[in-house]
Each structure stands twice: as structure tokens, then as C-alpha cells.
Amino acid sequence: MQTRNAFSWLKKQITRSISVSLMIYILTRTSISSAYPIFAQQGYENPREATGRIVCANCHLANKPVEIEVPQAVLPDTVFEAVVRIPYDMQLKQVLANGKRGGLNVGAVLILPEGFELAPPDRISPEMKEKIGNLSFQSYRPNKKNILVIGPVPGQKYSEITFPILSPDPATKKDVHFLKYPIYVGGNRGRGQIYPDGSKSNNTVYNATAAGIVSKIIRKEKGGYEITITDASDGRQVVDIIPPGPELLVSEGESIKFDQPLTSNPNVGGFGQGDAEIVLQDPLRVQGLLFFLASVILAQIFLVLKKKQFEKVQLAEMNF
């Protein structure tokens, strides 16, 4: 009986341990996958600074292109596509957090005019849903529905991201007007070089924090290096820690200068930003334009008919 109770207790403990381990794994995976937008969302009230710079550039230091395509004009209460393209060489591999190589992720932030927001699912057409795929967009803040973020997502599949946008209706939103509005976009591919707290990631170059002789290089068991730099004048030693990922450029016995690169720069990604303009068009203005064009066409037709009638009269008089 005691043996059976002990076995039952051991079984419960093993099951509990497995459940806890699984929960920790899931939570860890979730925090890593959603880290990039969270860095900006937690650190900045607005992703676009007064200078026009998007804050993602503070962590992604390399400058890369990004493209945005939107309609020239849209009508009120209409769903349209904002297509963001983040081009890069699909053959490239980036340094992951563990020092290994892997594919690049991409992410984007779309800053829309006030009143514009993510289209509700029931307003999105099947064709647009197919373009969107399995992407899940979120607002930058609960009170900033006009600012949307996405990522990180696999760059191999989503280097082109389609945002479904709903235009506002000035009839129901009095602070919205029929005007031309700017749209801003930022897009990154790959991991950043600096974390929000100012510390470096392993996806950047590491420089010497002192001048002297490289007296010792220790390769760490889990990857990375400990580099001891000895000052030739007073013997003072400084140890620089290199995380797994960057390739070492110096060797023992080498004389180095302050701020000299100790490693290569493994970064193959970067961040870019751009802008576009969109007109919120008044339907009455469109109707007026169509009426004007129709009247011009009718006037041209009547003019041609009148001219032909006049020519017939002239021809009849000449024959008479």
C-alpha cells in the first residue's frame, strides 16, 4: 500500500514538473517572438519623434530601404490596402541570440492619419485576406488605433506586408476632414544592435575598451570570448567579454588601440523609413467632377452634331 502511494506521489510530481517546464517554455517563446514591437511600445509613447525619425532606428543602426504603396485617394468608410515592402537578399543569414545562424525576421510600424485604423475582419474581402495571410496586427497603444505594428515575422514569407486599413467618415467623426494626409512607415529586417537599455546585442561589432597587448584569449564553453588586454606601461589589465556570434579579429600578443574593433560586424539587416500621401476624397466632389465631365462630353457631342448640321445646310445652299 505504501509502495502504491509512493508511486502515485512520484507520478504526480513528474506530471507537475513537465507541466511547469512546458509553461516556462511557452512563455519564453512568446516573450522572444514579441520582443521587437514591445521594445518600442514600452519605451516610447509615440514611435515617431519630433524630428521625423522613427524610434526603431535607435536600435537598428544600419540604414536599409523600405517601400510603401497606398491608393492616391480613398472614399470615406472604405477598406483599402497599404502595402509595405521590406526588400533584402533572401540568401542572407543573421546571428541569432544563441550565436548560431538563422533566417532574418522582419517587422514594420505604420503611422496613419488620425481617424484611420485597422479594418475589422468582417470588412476585409477574401482576396485581401489571402494577401494578408496569417499576420496579426496590433495597435501601438489602445488609444492610438492609427498606429499599427507587426513583427517579428519570417522575412522569407512576409517581406511584403499588406495592412487592411479602414478610412474614417467625416460625417461621424467631426475631427476628420476631406484633406490630403501623410502616412509614415518604418520597416526592419534582422535583429537590432542595441537594446533599449543601451546594452549591445551580439549582432554588432565589439571594440576594445582599452589600449595595450592582447595577453590572453579564453574561448568560453557556450561560445564567445574573454579577451584580456594588458597595458604595457603599468601592467593594468582589462577584460572584454565577447558574446557568441561575432567573429574574432585579434589574436594573443597583438598590440591594439583603444576602440579598435575586436570582432567583425555580423549585422546583415537594417532599418528604413518612408512616407506617402493619401487623399480622403469627398463623394460629392467626385460626383460633381463626374457631372462636369459628363457635361463637357455632351457639349462636345452637341457641338459636333451642330457642326455637321451646319455643313449640310451649307452644302444644300451650294447645290441650290
Curated annotation (Swiss-Prot):
Q: Which PANTHER family does the record associate with it? A: CYTOCHROME F, PTHR33288
The membrane topology of this protein is: Single-pass membrane protein
List ligand-binding residues for heme.
36, 56, 59-60
Details of cofactor binding: Binds 1 heme group covalently.
The record's similarity note reads: Belongs to the cytochrome f family.
Gene for this chain: petA
* Gene3D superfamilies linked to this entry: 2.40.50.100, Cytochrome f large domain, Single helix bin
Q: Which InterPro entries match?
A: Cyt-f_TM, Cyt_f, Cyt_f_lg_dom, Cyt_f_lg_dom_sf, Rudment_hybrid_motif
As cofactor, the record names: heme
Q: Name one GO cellular component term.
A: chloroplast thylakoid membrane
Write out the transmembrane intervals.
286-305
**What is the residue range of the signal peptide feature?**
1-35
Q: Tell me the subunit arrangement.
A: The 4 large subunits of the cytochrome b6-f complex are cytochrome b6, subunit IV (17 kDa polypeptide, petD), cytochrome f and the Rieske protein, while the 4 small subunits are PetG, PetL, PetM and PetN. The complex functions as a dimer.
User: Which function does this protein serve?
Assistant: Component of the cytochrome b6-f complex, which mediates electron transfer between photosystem II (PSII) and photosystem I (PSI), cyclic electron flow around PSI, and state transitions.
Q: What is its main location?
A: plastid
Question: Which HAMAP family does the entry mention?
Answer: Cytb6_f_cytF
The terms under GO molecular function for this entry are:
electron transfer activity; heme binding; iron ion binding
The UniProt keyword set, sorted, is: Chloroplast, Electron transport, Heme, Iron, Membrane, Metal-binding, Photosynthesis, Plastid, Signal, Thylakoid, Transmembrane, Transmembrane helix, Transport
What name goes with this protein? Cytochrome f
Q: Which organism is it from?
A: Nicotiana tabacum
Q: Where in the cell is it found?
A: Plastid, Chloroplast thylakoid membrane
Example of a GO biological process term: photosynthesis
